[in-house]
Structure formats: structure tokens, C-alpha cells
């Protein structure tokens, strides 16, 4: 019975760890730990000129709860007004990436939020347990300054600020 349960846990963990973006880095944390830092590359599917890299702890053969992650997003191609017109401009933005992080219903999400006043894309990475949980997060910004999508403020707007 215990062997079947252990086999099921390992199989589920292996399946869940394979979900997600493109792995570009894998750093082992030592001989006496089963944990690694995995670095994943994610290109925004709507704003294709933005690429994010997410670093997170992966413990494939462990029942630990890997919540810590960091995100860094940069402009890696052109960003057009048409791309910005297609995105969700609400204050909560939209989820652009989701990956299961453990067998305990924890999911890592990346949400894109548009700061219209500062013409900046915000990418918020966070993990949450669907039933309850601690919320850890990381933020990266991509300003539109210097892109085709940037709209220069008018002189009257600049004087009133």
C-alpha cells in the first residue's frame, strides 16, 4: 500500500514538473538536496516583443511547497500599438502564464497589468494554493518608452503635471 502511494506521488510530481515554458537553465543546489533552481523563458503571446525569465525552486522528488520565485522581463523585440490595443487594461490585468508547482494544488501564475499613466507593462509572478495559502510574489516592469507603442504626452499635459 505504501509503495503504491509513494509511486503515485512520484509519478504525479514528475508529470507536474514537466508543465510550462521553455527551460533555459538548471542549477543544482548541492549534493545533499533534491532541489534545483530552474530558469524558464516565457514570451508574451500578445506582446511578443517581451520575454520574461522566471527562476524558481524545483524539488521533483520532494513533498515540499516551492513558493519562492523571481521574474525578470525585458523588451526583446518590437512592441506595437496594435499589441497594446489587444491587452486587458483592467487594474487586475490578465494571466499570461500558469504552471502547477506542487501536488498540493499550488500554481504559479504570471499576470500582465498595464500602467496606462506611465505607459509601462507590469508582469507580476505569484504562487497561490487554490484552497488556502501563503502568497509570494515578484514584479518586473517593461516601459514602452522607445517603442512604437509609446505615446508622447502633449505639451499641455506635461505643463499640468
Region spans (language model):
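Residue-level signal for mature regions of secreted extracellular proteins and peptides
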Residues: 12, 45-46, 66
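Bacterial N-terminal signal peptides
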Residues: 7-14
Amino acid at each position: 500500500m505504501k509503495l503504491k502511494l509513494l509511486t503515485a506521488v512520484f509519478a504525479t510530481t514528475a508529470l507536474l514538473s514537466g508543465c510550462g515554458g521553455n527551460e533555459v537553465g538548471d542549477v543544482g543546489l548541492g549534493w545533499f538536496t533534491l532541489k534545483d533552481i530552474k530558469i524558464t523563458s516565457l514570451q508574451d503571446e500578445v506582446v511578443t516583443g517581451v520575454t520574461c525569465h522566471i527562476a524558481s525552486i524545483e524539488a521533483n522528488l520532494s513533498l515540499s511547497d516551492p513558493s519562492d520565485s523571481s521574474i525578470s522581463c525585458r523588451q526583446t523585440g518590437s512592441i506595437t500599438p496594435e499589441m497594446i490595443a489587444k491587452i486587458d487594461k483592467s487594474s487586475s490585468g490578465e494571466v499570461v502564464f500558469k504552471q502547477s508547482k506542487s501536488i498540493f494544488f499550488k500554481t504559479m501564475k504570471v499576470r500582465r497589468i498595464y500602467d496606462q499613466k506611465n505607459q509601462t507593462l507590469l508582469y507580476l509572478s505569484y504562487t497561490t494554493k487554490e484552497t488556502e495559502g501563503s502568497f509570494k510574489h515578484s514584479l518586473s516592469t517593461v516601459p514602452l518608452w522607445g517603442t512604437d507603442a509609446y505615446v508622447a504626452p502633449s505639451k499641455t499635459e506635461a505643463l499640468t503635471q
